[in-house]
Amino acid sequence: MRFNQYSYAKTKRENMLIELAELGFFYDSNRSDKENLEDFLRTSFFTYKNTDYPLKSWAADSQTDLLSFFQSDRELTASVFYTVAFQLLEFSPFIDFTDVEAFRQETDFPITFGDLLENLYQLLNTRTKNGNLLIDKLVSEGLIPEDNTHHCFNGKSLATFSSHDAIREVVYVESRVDTDQDGRPDLIKVSIIRPRYQGPVPAVMTASPYHQGTNDPASDKALHDMNVDLAKKEPHQITVQDPELKLLQLDSPVPAQEVSETEEKLGHIGTYTLNDYLLPRGFANLYVSGVGTKDSEGLMTSGDYQQIEAYKNVIDWLNGRCRAFTDHTRQREIKATWSNGKVATTGISYLGTMSNGLATTGVDGLEVIIAEAGISSWYNYYRENGLVTSPGGYPGEDFESLTELTYSRNLRAGDYLRNNDAYQQNLEQQRKDLDRQTGDYNQFWHDRNYLLHADKVKAEVVFTHGSQDWNVKPLHVYNMFRALPPHIKKHLFFHNGAHVYMNNWQSIDFRESINALLSKKLLGCESDFVLPAVIWQDNSQAQSWLTLEDFGGQEQNLHLQLGQDCQSIQNQYSEEDYNRFAKNYQSFKTELFDGKVNQITLDWTLEKDLFLNGATQLNLRLKSSTDKGLISAQLLDFGLAKRHTPIPTPIEPRVMDNGRYYMLDNLVELPFAETPHRVITKGFLNLQNRTNLLSVEEVTPDQWLEFSFELQPTIYKMKKGDQLRLVLYTTDFEHTVRDKIDYQLTVDLEQSSLDLPTMTSH
């Protein structure tokens, strides 16, 4: 384990004394450091009546137990302090370490022995081996009462609210959209879990179209056959209009009786562990599926601003700007009298996407979004540079299969009988509008491009994203991060995983950093906490994180010529190979990386260290033997070496306590293991869209074309002597349509190059 501590805030000495005393730790400057440490430990051992026993059970050094040490006249040394500190953090001497100084350096322990008051204060704010802050571990065991009142320590809210008798209720928010055009505002179901508290509390809201259930059979039937040829497109210029959102004007709302109690109780639901962690710390949890989902109204409009408006209206309700009812009759209105009006959003993938969209509405009350692996423009999810593409791991998926998956109203048989005809008409229109035939950008995609409205963002923004996320590719977070206005506070956790959550990783205090930010922004806890702009997981070693100033924006490039000759790529495969790759795209990837398919393979040995930060640009001069074509490219860190593997694996099951023995979570981490290669970046382009998205151009057979396009942005470090491998090819059996046409691309390597954005070493 290595310590990477970002949630700790420097605190004034007088405030440390006050905060410690409120927890029952009394530091006396008139006592020796040794006496203060003993008192601190005996207070920490509050679960024992006889605190001599745990002192005797612990070690001061390799020869002496702690009780004997405190009974002796020996001075407190750095070595003894570190030995005690590591035991408090659940490490075992003689098992986890034998040389405490070597272990301190190996783990990059954040505390330097000196000022004992500050040392003890920071120690309470340091993560244990099992993933909880020491103070959170002690509070979960009962250090202070569960009094349903906010308590902040080092600017972070403590778990002092009972999660076991939290209020669980349902309301139906009256939205400003009528997606099913029945003449009434769509009602949106809101599932609420909130702490019992006499005053107002903030909310964390997860906007998830999946939350009320999914229609997997319908979605599977809507998947597309990828074994089709690339379409030849007529040259033209694409035009789009500024997106419009028509909202209902509720100037004369239907009267409803105002009541103070909800009528529908919330049973068991699936929850998100970051929300679970925040609930006993005094944050209400809201789960909202939105339009077109089970127990809500309307149609599934999939990513447009009608869908986002309905989520926004929940925030409006929390701030008194929209109504909510106790049930679907709309006869009894209920206000969010428990809300302080401040909201943060959470969740990954589609959930993080809705956070991005909500932020671009500029809605008052949305203080922070935590957008984990979120989409910033839906075109870049299902299309790329004029090509129909599939998100990594999901060949054949397109927007209407996602619509089928999330339109959960059909899971209610009565809703199916009443509304399925209207839904099918809506689905058919969507199927036409997304234009799978050409892969071109159009008004449908323009209406689902949140980057156009990034200037409206007012909330503080936290992103998480993985360099190996080929589902929601890194381009999404890169574009959103760079599109935000300069005055907006923005932060990015950029890790080396795939499409995964990171709130229960051992190597970083992510959830505690979120606690510190939300406690400051939503609760008003006073602290000097500042989250860095970019927190990057160093790919060159295990459990190491660094802070950077930006993602992209580099002024230097490493320029690499591709070669000295011309080489060709054959598009067509034998029937046997084609069928084999179509059935198992993983076999295609394996052979591609080993240089065994129809491809050009180019290798470089680095002459100096490389620190890549941004989007690599591929500059090509090529020609096609026919009137169309696609080019695929992947850049690899090639050669046997230790690297992060992209899926976190459990270190210890159910050891991370989200409250007081509440929703225990697994402690996980990305393994750091020997692999033959690593994909650094990739990209795909339709030769007919080589200039820009809005231009469809002719491809004349055997005529040279010169163009550039960017591969997926990333942050990646390599050392002198490492090997870069670029593979150029046509059809990608995971991502693109699987064209069978017999044609070839010829690349002029001497007139082609690669530009890698580089930064000086951190």
Curated annotation (Swiss-Prot):
Its EC number is 3.4.14.11. It catalyses: Hydrolyzes Xaa-Pro-|- bonds to release unblocked, N-terminal dipeptides from substrates including Ala-Pro-|-p-nitroanilide and (sequentially) Tyr-Pro-|-Phe-Pro-|-Gly-Pro-|-Ile. This is Xaa-Pro dipeptidyl-peptidase. The lineage of its organism: Bacteria, Bacillati, Bacillota, Bacilli, Lactobacillales. Keywords: Aminopeptidase, Cytoplasm, Hydrolase, Protease, Serine protease. GO terms for molecular function: aminopeptidase activity; dipeptidyl-peptidase activity; serine-type peptidase activity. It comes from the Bacteria. It is found in: Cytoplasm. It is an enzyme of class 3 (hydrolase). The active site is at 349 (charge relay system), 469 (charge relay system), 499 (charge relay system). The gene is pepX. Pfam families: Peptidase_S15, PepX_C, PepX_N. PANTHER family: COCE_NOND FAMILY, PUTATIVE (AFU_ORTHOLOGUE AFUA_7G00600)-RELATED (PTHR43056:SF10), PEPTIDASE S9 PROLYL OLIGOPEPTIDASE (PTHR43056). HAMAP family: Aminopeptidase_S15. Belongs to the peptidase S15 family. One of its GO terms (cellular component) is cytoplasm. Its main location: cytoplasm. Disulfide bonds: none annotated. Homodimer. GO terms for biological process: proteolysis. Removes N-terminal dipeptides sequentially from polypeptides having unsubstituted N-termini provided that the penultimate residue is proline.
